[in-house]
Amino acid sequence: MSYSLAQIGMEAEAEVRVARAEVSEAAFTTEGSRPEEAPKDFFVERNGLRFAGTHLILDLWEAERLDDGPFMEEVLRRCVEAAGATLLHLHIHRFTPNGGLSGVAVLAESHISVHTWPERGYAAFDIFMCGEARPHAAIPILREAFRPRRVTIGEHLRGVF
């Protein structure tokens, strides 16, 4: 298990180096020139507030397919696409013997994480996104995919100032 975690970490570090190189190249018009515009901080401005991002907390009760790893991966990918976010890395881990899942979609705009307890029909999702991403767009996808009988949703605006 530690080998797979180290391997995941190495892959993530390589992806970050590539992303940094792409950002560095895109920020300049020619070598040694000034950036075309000031760096963007990806904070959100909405209703007169400026904040780091929107953090949604979803609890799904009496939900289906909470032990299906490939399905969970597909659903998370659809959530990322619907939100207009940029997927950097996706990992799902399946626990035995109950088949619970823990997963994370690492995004350029932050993350989506999930933990499931199939024996209880319960799933906990965190969706945190900054910039122009639309985290609320993931909610109907999760409802349709897992068909919960009860859903609770909390919203927290992170980094308000």
Question: What residue ranges belong to the model's regions?
Answer:
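Polybasic/polar functional segments that serve as interface/processing modules
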Residues: 1-161
